[in-house]
A protein has these predicted regions:
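Nucleotide-sugar donor phosphate/pyrophosphate-binding loop at the beta->alpha transition
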Residues: 138, 150-185, 191-198, 223-226
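Aromatic "clamp/platform" in nucleotide-sugar-dependent glycosyltransferases that forms part
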Residues: 323
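Acidic anion/phosphate-binding donor-loop and adjacent secondary structure
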Residues: 201, 217-233, 284
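Conserved acidic donor-binding segment of nucleotide-sugar-dependent glycosyltransferases
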Residues: 355-356, 360-367, 376-382
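Glycosyltransferase donor-sugar binding loop
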Residues: 43, 217, 244, 271-286, ...
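Short hydrophobic beta-strand element within catalytic cores of glycosyltransferases
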Residues: 317, 340-343, 353
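Nucleotide-activated donor-binding/catalytic signature segment of Leloir-type glycosyltransferases, i.e.
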Residues: 238, 284-303, 309
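Conserved donor-binding/catalytic core segment of Leloir-type glycosyltransferases
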Residues: 4, 190, 235-261, 273-275
């Protein structure tokens, strides 16, 4: 069979959504199926609205047995701020009834992919279309229209960021009227957690079309870290608290630093290591930190995977109190090393971390509570060991990529087998 995956940022870009589609697509390719990925030429997410950021030059290549077609991004005239202004306008319009048609048109103003229409017009046949990341709807809306015209089943993995309980300031960018309508019209919606599925069902997405599957890790790929090497190379003598993720306020990077400053003031000798790509507001925050705080921090932006594995092997506690994770693969990576995790009670994270059983949760942005959770794990090593071991057991039992893929594959089978009697089923190899 021939599957089309639509994902806005893909290899060589390292994103959670890109990894998800790569794990599914490359396994399909190994089974003998054809997989085409339609991506943009953005390397940095910000390139979608800011041409000064990085892009991927190659228009097409094959990686992991998957054909990648990169469509050039085009933007409306004006400075980069046009995009966030437009999205805020759309959020406000979404408060009004019957604005779905207008919102769909506005979603395609900027960024846009004129080459996508030409790609679809070329007549290439696909047995199923699977798109992801609902907030970047400029690529998903045309894919759904194409699937409907072609008679192909359409699957969406929206990666909805639910934000903090009772606070819709983040989720409203993922749950606008036209976005929810798109999910209602999808043949299947793959949610990260039951929390996300429940939120979508409350907005009218049919529960019988949803599957809460999530993401996974490959423990063999994560293994091999050398904690002693990390400690020697980065001069870490005592306990190590690790953060891995985009260095941004919404991801909890700033709150983690502020929580650690509380612990340092209370006498803790722990070191904080931060690995990830820094956003501009984080860099400004970090530059204003006093020298004494910087001396306790190991800032490692853009560290390679080998360094990340070494850091995981060296860590005593992993903390990423984010509100913008629909799942959070990096918690699973920490668990592979038996490291206890601290997350925020926001987004899909409470559907991943069982508070008090395999990790600890704190309210997003509550630096006192975050400090309390990290400090508790540093002080009570038996609790830390028990939570880390429980997390590792959960990963091996439920959250490997092989298990996740088998569930996604089952969704594909449901849809393609239902369609098979129509149009050329006798010439297609089955899943």
């Amino acid at each position: 069979m021939h599957f089309l995956h639509v994902v806005q940022l893909y290899y060589p870009v390292n994103t959670g959504a890109g990894r998800y589609f790569a794990e599914v697509g490359e396994r399909l390719a190994r089974e003998g199926h054809r997989v085409t990925v339609l991506a943009t030429d953005a390397y940095d997410l910000e390139y979608l609205w800011n041409p000064a950021r990085r892009r991927v030059a190659a228009p097409e290549e094959v990686h992991g047995g998957v054909r990648i077609v990169r469509l050039p991004v085009r933007r409306a005239p004006g400075p980069p701020i046009v995009y966030p202004i437009l999205r805020r306008l759309m959020v406000e319009l979404s408060r009004l009834p019957r604005t779905e048609p207008l919102l769909r048109r506005l979603a395609l103003v900027t960024p846009r992919l004129p080459a996508m229409r030409r790609f679809f017009a070329a007549g290439e046949r696909f047995d199923l279309v699977h798109a992801g990341n609902i907030t970047l709807d400029f690529a998903i809306l045309p894919a759904l229209d194409f699937a409907r015209r072609a008679g192909a089943p359409f699957v969406c993995t929206p990666f909805v960021h639910l934000g903090e309980p009772g606070d819709g300031s983040l989720s409203r960018y993922y749950l606008m009227r036209h976005q929810v309508d798109l999910l209602r019209r999808s043949d299947r919606v793959i949610a990260m957690t039951s929390l996300e599925a429940d939120a979508l069902a409350a907005r009218g997405v049919p529960p019988e079309r949803m599957r809460a599957i999530g993401v996974g890790v490959d423990p063999r790929e994560v293994a091999g870290g050398d904690g002693a090497r990390f400690r020697a190379q980065h001069t870490v003598a005592g306990p190590l608290v690790l953060y891995v993720g985009a260095l941004a306020r919404d991801k909890g990077a700033i709150h983690t630093i502020e929580a650690m400053r509380r612990l340092w003031e209370a006498g803790s000798d722990a070191t904080l290591a931060l690995i990830g790509a820094p956003l501009a507001h984080f860099t400004e925050f970090y530059e204003r930190l006093p020298a004494a705080a910087k001396a306790r921090i190991r800032l490692l932006p853009y560290a390679p995977d080998e360094v990340k594995r070494d850091a995981l092997a060296a860590a005593d506690v992993f903390a990423m109190p984010s509100r913008t994770d629909s799942f959070g693969i990096v918690y699973l990576e920490a668990w592979c090393y038996g490291v206890p995790v601290v997350g925020a009670r926001a987004g899909g994270v409470p559907g991943v971390i069982a508070d008090g059983q395999d990790g600890l949760l704190a309210p997003y942005g509550d630096t006192a509570a975050i400090a309390g959770a990290v400090g508790r794990l540093l002080a009570d090593r038996e609790l830390a060991r028990r939570l880390g071991a429980a997390g590792r057991a959960k990963v091996l039992r439920e959250l490997t990529w092989d298990r996740i893929y088998s569930q996604v594959r089952q969704v594909y089978e449901e849809l393609t087998e239902r369609r098979a009697p129509r149009a050329h089923s006798e010439t297609r190899p089955g899943l």
